[in-house]
């Protein structure tokens, strides 16, 4: 299957492997992502005129809002960042400003491009690493040796490289020069402060950027890989491509958008900080220029997907200007008992398959009877009804509770086949689910 030019039908088919139901949401998102590809096939003048139709996803937690957007961005290899609206404060207050989400997107985009370039140069990087280690292991030739000696040395070097590549010398120790660990820079500060931080680091680390270390050949391979990658990669080209890709095909997923909506119950927009964040967000969604450490980026062609449960507020509680910037609205369905069962049995990497794989590491073969899976779905659904509805996330905690003893005593079950029955599920969970006061402990 192709990636960037996947059709909406192909996108939905891919999502169906991981997410059950939510047909309307999948369809809307698939069309929005396909339109990104369509726009890039047009003439430059027309490309500038076409802006993405931002999406507002409405649905309870755990119904698949984030997963739908994340899965598509991953398969199509698009710059993607997920942020929470409630983490931001308006300009002038202590906290993260909304422009930092664009800076995070650019950081992710540059990293994505860098990894692609590393993958293309993978063989070349490995060859350079192996050659450098081989030359460390073999003593250098003295000056003025004969051609015959030079040929012998070249043959020895080649054999040494082959042995290093095959891992035969992984345990041998060598002394190499490696770069000192760089100081972490906070990328969420304004670009002006970021540049000051970078300049200070350059000044203090100019002369002391390398140290000698004794490492095993295996460790040296990893240490030298990053260093040689930097020398072979064109960092400026990567930065420019990362900026361009973030600008033309970036996706920002804003979760918990309902947390910055001012509910009418709270009294006619009396929370200035929430409304302030909305007003700060507005120019970014509409289209503005944001300065990052890699350069300036225009935001009008970034696709924004906002999501929220809207239990205590309504989409209409957002300021009208922001509502207008999310013209496509999709309501996601709450999960039924049947959908819970399908999530456990039909998804490509279902929770059951994950736990089976984890316990197989300990030599324990876990099998679930169909009645046991149905009981898990039923009890998880009932827990959601009696307590907070956390959607599919409830399945993680119910299965964890059922398998708790087996996971803890895994070495006692090593080499055995363990079958999870309906009765076992009931004995582990039914008392808790039946008691409404204890439901809250099955998070």
From Swiss-Prot:
Gene Ontology biological process terms in this record: protein unfolding; proteolysis involved in protein catabolic process
GO cellular component: HslUV protease complex
A GO term for molecular function: ATP hydrolysis activity
Main location: cytoplasm
Gene3D superfamilies from the UniProt entry: 1.10.8.60, P-loop containing nucleotide triphosphate hydrolases
Transmembrane segments: none
Keyword terms, alphabetized: ATP-binding, Chaperone, Cytoplasm, Nucleotide-binding
Cell location: Cytoplasm
Pfam family, one: AAA
Residues bound to ATP: 20, 62-67, 255, 321, 393
Quaternary organization: A double ring-shaped homohexamer of HslV is capped on each side by a ring-shaped HslU homohexamer. The assembly of the HslU/HslV complex is dependent on binding of ATP.
Family under the similarity heading: Belongs to the ClpX chaperone family. HslU subfamily.
Purpose of the protein: ATPase subunit of a proteasome-like degradation complex; this subunit has chaperone activity. The binding of ATP and its subsequent hydrolysis by HslU are essential for unfolding of protein substrates subsequently hydrolyzed by HslV. HslU recognizes the N-terminal part of its protein substrates and unfolds these before they are guided to HslV for hydrolysis.
Name used for this protein in its record: ATP-dependent protease ATPase subunit HslU
Organism for this UniProt entry: Helicobacter pylori (strain ATCC 700392 / 26695)
């Amino acid at each position: 299957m192709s990636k960037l030019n996947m059709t909406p039908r192909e996108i939905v088919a891919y999502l169906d492997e991981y997410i059950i139901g939510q047909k309307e949401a999948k369809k809307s998102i698939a069309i929005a992502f396909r339109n990104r590809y369509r726009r890039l096939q047009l003439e430059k003048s027309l490309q500038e005129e076409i802006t993405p139709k931002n999406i507002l996803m409405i649905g309870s937690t755990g119904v698949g809002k984030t997963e739908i957007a994340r899965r598509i961005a991953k398969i199509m290899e698009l710059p993607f960042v997920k942020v929470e609206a409630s983490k931001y404060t308006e300009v002038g207050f202590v906290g993260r400003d909304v422009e930092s989400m664009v800076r995070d997107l650019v950081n992710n985009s540059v990293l994505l491009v860098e990894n692609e370039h590393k993958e293309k140069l993978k063989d070349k990087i490995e060859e350079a690493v192996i050659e450098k280690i081989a030359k460390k292991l073999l003593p250098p030739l003295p000056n003025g040796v004969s051609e015959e000696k030079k040929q012998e040395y070249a043959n020895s070097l080649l054999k040494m490289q082959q042995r290093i590549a095959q891992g035969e010398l992984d345990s041998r120790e060598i002394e190499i020069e490696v770069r000192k660990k760089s100081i972490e820079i906070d990328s969420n500060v304004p670009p002006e402060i970021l540049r000051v931080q970078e300049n200070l680091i350059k000044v203090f680390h100019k002369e002391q950027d390398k140290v000698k270390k004794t490492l095993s050949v295996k460790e040296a391979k990893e240490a030298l890989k990053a260093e040689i990658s930097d020398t072979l990669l064109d960092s400026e080209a990567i930065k420019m491509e990362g900026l361009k890709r973030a600008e033309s095909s970036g996706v920002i997923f804003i979760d918990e958008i309902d947390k910055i909506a001012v509910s009418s119950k709270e009294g006619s927009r009396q929370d200035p900080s929430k409304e302030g964040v909305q007003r700060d967000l507005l120019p970014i969604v509409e289209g503005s220029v944001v300065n990052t450490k890699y350069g300036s980026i225009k935001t009008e062609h970034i696709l924004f997907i906002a999501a929220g449960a809207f239990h205590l507020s309504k989409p209409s509680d957002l300021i009208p200007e922001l509502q207008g910037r999310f013209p496509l609205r999709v309501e996601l369905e709450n999960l039924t008992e049947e959908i819970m069962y399908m999530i456990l049995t039909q998804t490509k990497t279902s929770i059951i398959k994950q736990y089976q794989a984890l316990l197989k590491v300990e030599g324990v073969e876990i099998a679930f009877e169909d009645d046991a899976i149905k009981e898990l779905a039923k009890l998880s659904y009932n827990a959601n009804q009696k307590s907070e509805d956390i959607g599919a996330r409830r399945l993680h905690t119910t299965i964890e509770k059922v398998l708790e003893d087996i996971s803890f005593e895994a070495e006692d079950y090593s080499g055995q086949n363990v079958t999870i029955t309906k009765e076992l599920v009931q004995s582990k969970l039914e008392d808790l689910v039946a008691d409404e006061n204890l439901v809250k402990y099955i998070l």
